[in-house]
Amino acid sequence: MSSDYSNISELIEEEYNNSKSVGIFVSRFDKSEGVGTVVNRHISELNDAGIDVTLFAYEQVDEIAEKKVVNVSSSLTGNNTLNKLISSMNPLKWLSLSSELKKLDLLIVHQPILCSIAYYAQKIHDIDTIYYNHEVTRPEDKVGTIQRIYGYTLFQIYLHISSRLDQIVSVSKYSQQEYSRRFDRQGMVIHNSIDHEMYNQSVDGSRIREKYDLEDDPLVLFVGRIAKSKGIHRLISVFEDVSKTIPDATLVIVGRPDNQGYYQRVKVLSKSVDQQIIFAGIVPEEDLPAYYSAADLYATCSIKEGYNLTIAEAEACGTPTIAFDIGAHSEVMNDGVLVPKDNTSLFKEEMVSQLTKQR
């Protein structure tokens, strides 16, 4: 993979060398999610480069030791989505953030819903701004009535505002092409990076096998949100077919439910092979390398990905990977199996083939 810069700190050093204080905007800071993982690594990289970082977020799931966090959400309703929307289009909220914004040299925005605040800072306080494009989400991919309405209305406005920020950085050439097709702005590419000191082939996964009493059973792993776009229902259906050929196989799903309705749906789907599917929930990032190393195969049936860090993490740990040939997968995957989109029968055959090789 070729990038314009190897990481975010290199970009800032080369093009924003007077920036000593950076604000990072993210809707939900959750290190169990892809965007949250990227943001966390950006914070670490910038700190190592001697740059002060302030995190601006609507929701904060994970703590950041000794780092400044500014909550940009309102609390007018009991609905988080509505509170975010109210804050995002409320000029009084933007004004209330001015004292914090004026201290910064550069803003990096990771989601469209925060672009209105960044654009305000760009125009009023003359602060440099970067929109970090992970993917261009389609309105129909959003879950829930409020999210769908937002997707077809305000989201489109915020996405347009993102194109008015000073610089566009995409996490893959695929995401760059999708964005430039929409807004005729190319921007640059900085591929997401992983920590090779954490994710490498020397990691021992035996404690994960011991934890779930798997011994030498064939183990398939998925890491990510339990969301429709991640294709968990398809993965379970494919695994059900795989288990008919390899009856001692186990599927471990690591990650939090994105939507309770969908989570209940996949739990029902898993009933037929209930003893062979483990929903591990959220696990600490420091434990993830052991999960990858314990697995014989990393599998994802995701249908939209602007990057997909988990494939890169699995391969770094020496675990074979399989995925549909969608989004940026062909950029990320170095030595795995790409299956034509929606071809679940071939996906099953390749899973069986890969698991058989590992035995």
Curated annotation (Swiss-Prot):
One of the protein's GO biological processes: S-layer organization
- Function comment: Hexosyltransferase involved in N-glycan biosynthetic pathway that takes place under low-salt conditions (1.75 M instead of 3.4 M). Participates in the formation of the tetrasaccharide present at 'Asn-532' of S-layer glycoprotein Csg, consisting of a sulfated hexose, 2 hexoses and rhamnose. Involved in the addition of sugar 3 to the disaccharide-charged dolichol phosphate in the tetrasaccharide.
- Lineage per the UniProt record: Archaea, Methanobacteriati, Methanobacteriota, Stenosarchaea group, Halobacteria
- This protein is called Low-salt glycan biosynthesis hexosyltransferase Agl9
Which protein family is named in the record? Belongs to the glycosyltransferase group 1 family.
Cystine bridges: none
EC class, as a word, reads transferase
Keywords of the record, alphabetical order, are: Glycosyltransferase, Transferase
Phenotype seen when the gene is deleted:
Impaired formation of the tetrasaccharide present at 'Asn-532' of S-layer glycoprotein Csg. No effect on 'Asn-47' and 'Asn-117' glycosylation of S-layer glycoprotein Csg.
The pathway where this protein functions is: Protein modification; protein glycosylation; Cell surface structure biogenesis; S-layer biogenesis
EC number(s) reported in the record: 2.4.1.-
Q: Which GO terms describe its molecular function?
A: glycosyltransferase activity
Which PANTHER family does the protein's record reference?
A: SULFOQUINOVOSYL TRANSFERASE SQD2 (PTHR45947:SF3)
> Which InterPro entries does this UniProt record tie to the protein?
Glyco_trans_1, Glyco_trans_4-like_N, Glycosyltransferase_grp1
Transmembrane regions: none
